[in-house]
């Protein structure tokens, strides 16, 4: 794909983001944190990086100084990830961590550009069983994750790179709105 078409695809995906849903997600996360709960985020590959970026903006700060906010990325503890993958299966690397760390009222975000990452789906299922509010960040058709999470923010693109760019855009939008509440 040439550069102009790539930019056009990114612009189209950005214009098709559901702003009302994004505002609702920011409100849900803010409310959970204000109530003493936390945000838990996970994904694979570039989505793992997005999960860590999201958490860094909340535990550090985004655009203004504020207190650190309770957020955990389940993609950072390589010992836990590799032990779970080795002893059980890579399919449960997030669900086992969710079972250990989540409590009712937490918000759990699973990021998967295809919506079909088995370990992300299993992590969301575990979070729902615990009583967490679950959110999927997806692309393409939303995949299987769309039918599992309480709500889905789907990027209207089939290009993984564009989906990832829009996920980080959405994460920044959410962090900016959360900043205003704390």
From Swiss-Prot:
It is found in: Cytoplasm. SUPFAM superfamilies: SIS domain. HAMAP family: GmhA. Residues 29-182 form the SIS domain. This is Probable phosphoheptose isomerase. Catalyzes the isomerization of sedoheptulose 7-phosphate in D-glycero-D-manno-heptose 7-phosphate. The lineage of its organism: Archaea, Methanobacteriati, Thermoplasmatota, Thermoplasmata, Thermoplasmatales. Coiled coil: none annotated. It catalyses: 2 D-sedoheptulose 7-phosphate = D-glycero-alpha-D-manno-heptose 7-phosphate + D-glycero-beta-D-manno-heptose 7-phosphate. Pathway: Carbohydrate biosynthesis; D-glycero-D-manno-heptose 7-phosphate biosynthesis; D-glycero-alpha-D-manno-heptose 7-phosphate and D-glycero-beta-D-manno-heptose 7-phosphate from sedoheptulose 7-phosphate: step 1/1. Disulfide bonds: none annotated. Substrate binds at residues 44-46, 57, 86-87, 112-114, 117, 164. It is an enzyme of class 5 (isomerase). Belongs to the SIS family. GmhA subfamily. Its main location: cytoplasm. Its EC number is 5.3.1.28. Keywords: Carbohydrate metabolism, Cytoplasm, Isomerase, Metal-binding, Zinc. Zn(2+) binds at residues 53, 57, 164, 172. The gene is gmhA. One of its GO terms (biological process) is D-glycero-D-manno-heptose 7-phosphate biosynthetic process. PANTHER family: DNAA INITIATOR-ASSOCIATING PROTEIN DIAA, SEDOHEPTULOSE 7-PHOSPHATE ISOMERASE / DNAA INITIATOR-ASSOCIATING FACTOR FOR REPLICATION INITIATION. GO terms for molecular function: carbohydrate derivative binding; D-sedoheptulose 7-phosphate isomerase activity; zinc ion binding.
């Amino acid at each position: 794909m040439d550069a102009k078409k790539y930019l056009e695809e990114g612009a189209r995906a950005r214009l098709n983001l559901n702003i009302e849903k994004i505002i609702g997600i920011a409100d849900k996360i803010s409310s959970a944190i204000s109530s003493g709960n936390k945000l838990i985020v996970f994904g694979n590959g570039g989505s793992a990086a997005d999960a860590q970026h999201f958490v860094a903006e909340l535990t550090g700060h985004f655009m203004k100084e504020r207190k650190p906010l309770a957020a955990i990325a389940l993609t950072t503890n390589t010992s836990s990830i590799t032990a779970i993958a080795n002893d059980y299966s890579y399919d449960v690397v997030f669900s086992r961590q969710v079972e250990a760390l989540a409590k009712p009222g937490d918000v759990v975000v699973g990021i998967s550009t295809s919506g079909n990452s088995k370990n992300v789906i299993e992590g969301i299922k575990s979070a729902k069983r615990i009583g967490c509010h679950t959110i999927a960040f997806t692309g393409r058709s939303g995949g299987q994750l769309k039918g599992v999470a309480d709500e889905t923010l789907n990027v209207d693109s089939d290009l993984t790179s564009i989906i990832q760019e829009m996920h980080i855009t959405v994460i920044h939008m959410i962090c900016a709105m959360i900043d205003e509440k704390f």
